[in-house]
């Protein structure tokens, strides 16, 4: 879906707030105001386009909004040791402006959504099918905004009625509680589920848009953030059963990380961020909602942060040695490497000769004696996922907002693994949970798990899901940071120790050592070794609310990261103990 550029001023930007009259006035269409805009379906459809465009900005998903969570997880480390470093080290100060960009851009999204939702009214029964789709999409996108704001900043301001801030004073809201924020997220997704069509019923219209399947998937995710496993399981079962349309795993895992109509918005995707294919883009990088351009590239820069320096990338982020070794530790039933490794980490492996595009890095052949690293000063395993490192599209990184690969934010494999997790939480290890996991493993050619190996041990099956199945399936994607928070891994001594081990990496300019295993036990003995989680400060599993934002709003206070306060007393359930799977 191509998202056309609409002027932010026309689409009710933050600086043009005013009260609205619901009556239609005859006015000059070229001189729209907040009093005349939004009184018909056509103008509200333009607002929908604007909202979708906002989720493609720097602070939402085009770069920082995506990669901050990737940094927070234990599958990725900051190989530049400059850009993102305080966020990777989980000790970002509240004066770091980068941390404000997601806050800024998600509230732009919320503003446009609020305007449209308010225009639609509260009584859904009187809405036409077109208006239901408009309101449903905006509820989904507002829910998505608050999902991200709550997961990042813990206590965001909740603004859900456009009329309540039609004056400037109404903008200075107070913090919500964590529970209040998740309540709002759940409410928005739940209502969106009732208004939107399925991907099947929506047909061509549904391509690239939010559907009831997307809303259901995110509703389950939101429920799981507070350990509402029984409720989430019911929703996930409905998705699997086809209530919200047909979804299935793509036969080729790599099809989830390529651009083009043959791969994007496929049968596995519940929701993805739409970007224009390379070669069809404009020339202007549109980083923020205030520098819009009719000739915007409409691409993302996640690839720029992941890309190796030798290939023109910014060389900022690398895959963790733990993730690489996890892939190498289990072969397929035919004795080969897990094919997901090829699409996740850009290493040379003899087995990749003849597989897909072979041993290439941006069409440049790789050899065993000339490995590619992310950063020439600090090394690092290059991240292949959501880049063109393995797609054969071009021979070097095109930096800036030029990557055209749609970011698949929720896939059917996530539904299956979450259903297995919830089933395990509710009923303990069952054959049903194992079967759902095995669907994902079978796509990769791995052997089936056996219930007998987990019988009566929910902690062991959780370990398998959390630290084997999910990292292999979703390694280096957005979401791992959210998982670590909801699982309580920062609040348990053995789990914190575990993520310190997972987060250990080597800083070296010796490219021959890039694939070596590392040991947390040697941190402090070997100056090249470091673990990001050693520098974690209590409360900084969330990101601090920017001090400039606090200065502008006297009603707003900092969160646990601003105050360096522990959240251990705010858990929604016990933390699973570490279980040795070997």
Q: Model features per residue range: what roles?
A:
Residues 327-411, 578-582:
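Flexible, polar/acidic helix-loop-strand segments at domain edges
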Residues 21-80, 190-193, 209-368, 496, ...:
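An aromatic- and glycine-enriched ligand-binding surface/loop that stacks and positions planar moieties
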Residues 40-59, 81-153, 172-180, 189-202, ...:
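Conserved, well-structured interaction surfaces
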Residues 20-21, 52, 76, 106-107, ...:
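Long, intrinsically disordered, low-complexity segments
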Residues 182, 229, 429-430:
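TPR-repeat structural position
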């Amino acid at each position: 879906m191509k998202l056309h550029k609409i002027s932010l001023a026309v689409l009710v930007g933050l600086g043009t707030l005013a009260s609205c009259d619901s009556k239609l006035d005859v006015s000059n269409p070229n001189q729209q105001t907040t009093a005349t805009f939004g009184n018909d379906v056509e103008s509200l459809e333009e607002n929908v386009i604007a909202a979708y465009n906002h989720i493609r900005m720097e602070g939402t998903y085009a770069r920082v909004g995506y990669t901050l969570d990737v940094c927070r997880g234990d599958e990725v480390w900051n190989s530049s040791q400059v850009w993102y470093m305080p966020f990777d080290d989980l000790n970002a100060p509240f004066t770091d402006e980068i941390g404000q960009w997601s806050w800024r851009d998600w509230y732009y999204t919320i503003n446009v959504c609020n305007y449209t939702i308010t225009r639609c009214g509260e009584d859904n029964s009187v809405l036409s099918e077109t208006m239901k789709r408009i309101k449903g999409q905006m509820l989904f996108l507002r829910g998505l905004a608050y999902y991200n704001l709550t997961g990042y900043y813990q206590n965001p301001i909740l603004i859900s009625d456009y009329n309540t801030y039609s004056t400037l004073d109404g903008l200075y809201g107070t913090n919500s509680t964590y529970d209040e924020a998740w309540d709002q997220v759940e409410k928005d997704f739940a209502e969106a589920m009732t208004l939107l069509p399925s991907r099947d019923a929506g047909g061509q219209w549904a391509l690239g848009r939010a559907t009831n399947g997307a809303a259901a998937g995110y509703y389950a995710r939101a429920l799981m953030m507070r350990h509402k496993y029984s409720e989430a399981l019911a929703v996930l079962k409905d998705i699997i059963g086809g209530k919200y349309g047909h979804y299935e795993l793509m036969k080729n895992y790599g099809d989830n990380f390529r651009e083009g109509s043959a791969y994007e918005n496929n049968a596995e995707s519940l929701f993805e961020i739409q970007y224009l294919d390379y070669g069809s883009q404009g020339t202007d990088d549109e980083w923020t909602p205030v520098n819009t351009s009719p000739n915007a590239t409409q691409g993302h820069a996640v690839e720029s942060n992941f890309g190796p320096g030798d290939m023109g990338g910014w060389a900022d982020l690398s895959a963790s040695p733990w993730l690489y070794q996890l892939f190498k530790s289990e072969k397929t039933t035919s004795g080969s490497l897990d094919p997901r490794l090829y699409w996740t980490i850009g290493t040379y492996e003899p087995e990749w000769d003849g597989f897909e595009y072979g041993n290439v890095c941006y069409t440049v052949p790789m050899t065993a004696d000339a490995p590619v690293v992310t950063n020439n000063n600090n090394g690092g395993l290059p991240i292949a996922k959501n880049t063109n490192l393995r797609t054969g599209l071009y021979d070097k990184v095109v930096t800036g907002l030029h990557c055209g690969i749609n970011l698949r934010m929720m896939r059917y494999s996530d539904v299956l693994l979450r259903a297995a997790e919830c089933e395990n939480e509710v009923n303990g290890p069952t054959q049903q949970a194992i079967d759902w996991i095995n669907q994902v493993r079978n796509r990769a050619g791995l052997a089936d798990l056996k219930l007998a190996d987990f019988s009566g041990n929910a902690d062991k099956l959780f370990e398998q899901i959390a630290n084997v199945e999910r990292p292999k399936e979703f390694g280096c994607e957005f979401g791992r940071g959210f998982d670590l928070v909801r699982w309580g891994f920062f609040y348990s001594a053995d789990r914190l120790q575990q993520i310190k081990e997972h987060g250990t990496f080597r800083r070296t300019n010796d490219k021959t050592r890039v694939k070596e295993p590392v040991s947390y036990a040697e941190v402090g003995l070997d100056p090249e070794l470091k673990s990001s989680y050693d520098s974690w400060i209590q409360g900084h599993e969330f990101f601090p609310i920017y001090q400039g934002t606090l200065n502008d709003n006297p009603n707003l206070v900092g969160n646990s990261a601003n105050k360096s306060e522990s959240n251990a007393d705010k858990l929604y359930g016990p933390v699973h103990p570490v279980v040795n799977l070997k």
